[in-house]
């Protein structure tokens, strides 16, 4: 009996001790994903005395030190976390290296107030590792091409395609007018950049740097105007991408469609060292809807600075390109440089008046990822003065249908006497207005804004002094800017003044509302600088904090820009510019986005559904107004078809 009792006592103690010493476990399913965007489920159990500060870290490459995670999630996002077990599902991007996942215990007493992320939240501690998963792989491996995006070249019957793969083995594009017969091919040039090319931390630190893979660049040639082409990139030995398609550019087209915005960034399914942009998901979603509605009409996208907001954390570029691939692989994706791609402490051009303007917003990238991951038309470049390769894609232009598009850099020298100024001058003076009656200039930092961006006051003054006379003299139709994360439309303006009659004054729009959610306040009233009193100046015709993008539609007679809001995908502001010089201010009245397959560029945007009687009544009223307006316009413009004078019909609106 005594022996039996001792046996059971020993068994009880051993079971108790075993239970007390049990370790947390973590598993993943599946252990291999096919492509970027596929999801993995991470499950854990055995977490004793769980805390709402316990967290899950994502690591790639898998041998990364504990504090070199790419992102994290708190375990309390699972509904069962208090019971010591749970699961989280995460869509992941192929970083050309395996992932692993680790669970940590973290307590309030271990919070380091000096160790914070971009939002000033304390970064989680890594002192107590509870469990680590097996490695997660991508079935496509490092060789499969991803991050596919298109752009125009200097030749009108071509289309550039760029993509990323994990090794430098030769890749190709094959293309044709049928997805079943990709009979044309071209070899792609591979290139890469190294950690030593970065100019500061975090880009050149062990935390921010990740291998960017190989960037491939090739051109599809001898394209027929306005024809849909199918293509895929890759190689027989490493694998081919899915088949994508696009509509070739037609410079003689009678209609132009473009989707334009700035400061979009990207979203990540985890929290990381820097702020990411959840609103960018909606921006991409609505633009994809509009592209699909176009059918076989060509279009393009213009992203005017602050592209990914990686700011030195390399993998954020991968997240960005994975997010935009559905649209960037279908229409050309054009960019200009912003402060968050470029600015660094030793940048070559930093005059005394700009010492407080050009800081370290590039996170040590000094324009390198931007310069190599994109290849825009033209050959503009500036030396960085360091090991980094020259900064490219600074200023360039091209025609698309009825519009001449110009891109400029506000981060490098734009003053008189500089190479960029001379390019802008020559380019604007050489535009054939019979071929392209409308000219659209785009840059990152705005020439005009009514936000309280006092730091950029001097650069705005310099832009007005040096660039605005070129815009006015050469009858620029529209100037688009980002940097301020709001939408704002100005009257046709020159020297901060608008009246009733001008000669060629451009309309300025700030369109930095595509994703970044840090928003400055509007300019307060001078005698109440510390109170939320924000009068809207007369020059500002419409402004809002709503996220979204702009849609440009132009034919030979009219260019229309509409602001589409992300919360409903509908138009919230519209402005029309006629080839004759007349500018018609729009309204904040929300209108449904037309089906671009069937609605011509000149069509009036239809409002929300209403009764037939009311619709016909409004229609009759519009016809009367249209006749009167046509008579007035005809009276003042008869015999003066070449006049560039602008007449502005103002309607002033604001959304807050």
UniProtKB/Swiss-Prot annotation:
Cofactor(s) needed: Fe cation; Zn(2+)
A GO MF label: mitochondrion targeting sequence binding
Keyword Mitochondrion: no
GO biological process annotation, one example: protein targeting to mitochondrion
InterPro entries: Calcineurin-like_PHP_ApaH (IPR004843), Metallo-depent_PP-like (IPR029052), MPP_PAP (IPR041792), Purple_acid_Pase-like_N (IPR008963), Purple_acid_Pase_N (IPR015914), Purple_acid_PPase_C_dom (IPR025733)
Signal peptide (residue range): 1-19
Gene Ontology annotations for the cellular component aspect, listed alphabetically: chloroplast; chloroplast envelope; endosome; extracellular region; Golgi apparatus; mitochondrial envelope; mitochondrion; trans-Golgi network
Known glycosylation sites: 34, 76, 98, 204, 379, 475, 495
Keyword GTP-binding in annotation: no
Residues binding Fe cation, per UniProt: 306, 309, 485
Subcellular location: Secreted
Tissue: Expressed in roots, stems, leaves, flowers and siliques.
Domain of life of the source: Eukaryota
Cofactor note: Binds 1 Fe cation per subunit. Binds 1 zinc ion per subunit.
Annotated positions binding substrate: 339, 483-485
Keywords recorded for this protein, A-Z: Glycoprotein, Iron, Metal-binding, Secreted, Signal, Zinc
Assembly description: Homodimer.
Family: Belongs to the metallophosphoesterase superfamily. Purple acid phosphatase family.
Name the record gives this protein: Probable inactive purple acid phosphatase 2
Organism of provenance: Arabidopsis thaliana (Mouse-ear cress)
Gene this chain is encoded by: PAP2
